[in-house]
Amino acid sequence: MGSVPVPVANVPRIDVSPLFGDDKEKKLEVARAIDAASRDTGFFYAVNHGVDLPWLSRETNKFHMSITDEEKWQLAIRAYNKEHESQIRAGYYLPIPGKKAVESFCYLNPSFSPDHPRIKEPTPMHEVNVWPDEAKHPGFRAFAEKYYWDVFGLSSAVLRGYALALGRDEDFFTRHSRRDTTLSSVVLIRYPYLDPYPEPAIKTADDGTKLSFEWHEDVSLITVLYQSDVQNLQVKTPQGWQDIQADDTGFLINCGSYMAHITDDYYPAPIHRVKWVNEERQSLPFFVNLGWEDTIQPWDPATAKDGAKDAAKDKPAISYGEYLQGGLRGLINKNGQT
């Protein structure tokens, strides 16, 4: 008997271009679509977003295919290279031959220069980015920093849509998501094709599905993901696991667990997982994070009436820095070092 086909999740394509404009009614129409998606499977594709995705994929592929093992070691985060004491988040996440196939390069806010107040203090979760040699990778840093601000701009527009969807002012989220303080990160993940593929790099779920990364909720306010046109993601629904169709023309967007916390799970963080697929592909998430001290008081949108924004009585306010530290630590403890 053949395997039972997995249902396809409802993941709508939403035209987000009105969120860059001034037409309030069109913005509210987008907000209603975001609201419906957020309370269904929790995912939607943002289209007409204004970001050059072929350029993003092409430049990322050029970097992934040209960086050497020695360069990866020189850029490695502390979890892999103990000499790099200050690199907790930013840097290269190494593959381990025979054990771990996925590899990635993470970079943070380009505003975090050596004279930034949070770097000088220093404050956890803030790091100065490390970059490969410009002579060996000409233009890579310029590309990466430009992409950061391109996707930051898109994310700001989408956050305006989320704010309207929740009955808030448009700047409800963006006032906490500022260029000089945001802890948002870009991760350029490579899933390679390998022959043979190392068995220890393949995990098996309780239902027998082979996985590259086990179930989890994202540690973010929202996540804005570009991925290759290779189906790999699954979302957990009341009807069971469902496939999220791949679409390399849009950004796949979902709420993270901070959004779930502050909305009292009105917008939950969808539980999802990454299937094992032995095919060369990219997964390039932008984890949208607020600033270190930014704190949003939780409330229950479902019970707010007549403009009232009642606090969720059993949900304490958590600063974003505290949330991010604990969330990333918990994810590593659960699923291992990426």
UniProtKB/Swiss-Prot annotation:
Q: Which UniProt keywords apply?
A: Antibiotic biosynthesis, Cytoplasm, Iron, Metal-binding, Oxidoreductase
- Cofactor: how and how many bound: Binds 1 Fe(2+) ion per subunit.
Does the keyword Magnesium belong to this entry? no
| GO biological process per UniProt | penicillin biosynthetic process
Involved in ACV-binding (site feature) positions: S283
**Annotated phenotype, changing H49L:** Strongly reduces the catalytic activity
Q: What is the effect of changing H216L?
A: Impairs the catalytic activity
Which GO molecular function annotations are given, in alphabetical order? iron ion binding; isopenicillin-N synthase activity
Pathway membership, UniProt: Antibiotic biosynthesis; penicillin G biosynthesis; penicillin G from L-alpha-aminoadipate and L-cysteine and L-valine: step 2/3
Keyword flag Oxidoreductase: yes
In the UniProt annotation, what is the result of changing H137L? Reduces the catalytic activity
Q: What would changing Q337L do, according to UniProt?
A: Does not affect the catalytic activity
Binding annotation for N-[(5S)-5-amino-5-carboxypentanoyl]-L-cysteinyl-D-valine: R89, Y93, S185, Y191, H216, D218, S283
Recorded catalytic activity of this chain's protein: N-[(5S)-5-amino-5-carboxypentanoyl]-L-cysteinyl-D-valine + O2 = isopenicillin N + 2 H2O
Q: Could you say which residues are annotated as the site Transition state stabilizer?
A: F213
Q: Which residues form the Fe2OG dioxygenase domain?
A: 182-290
Q: What is the effect of changing H126L?
A: Strongly reduces the catalytic activity
* Principal localisation: cytoplasm
EC number(s) per UniProt?
1.21.3.1
The subcellular localization recorded is: Cytoplasm, Cytosol
Where does this protein hold isopenicillin N?
R89, Y93, S185, Y191, S283
Highest rank taxon of the organism: Eukaryota
Protein name per its UniProtKB record: Isopenicillin N synthase
Please give the organism.
Answer: Hapsidospora chrysogena
Gene, per the UniProt record: PCBC
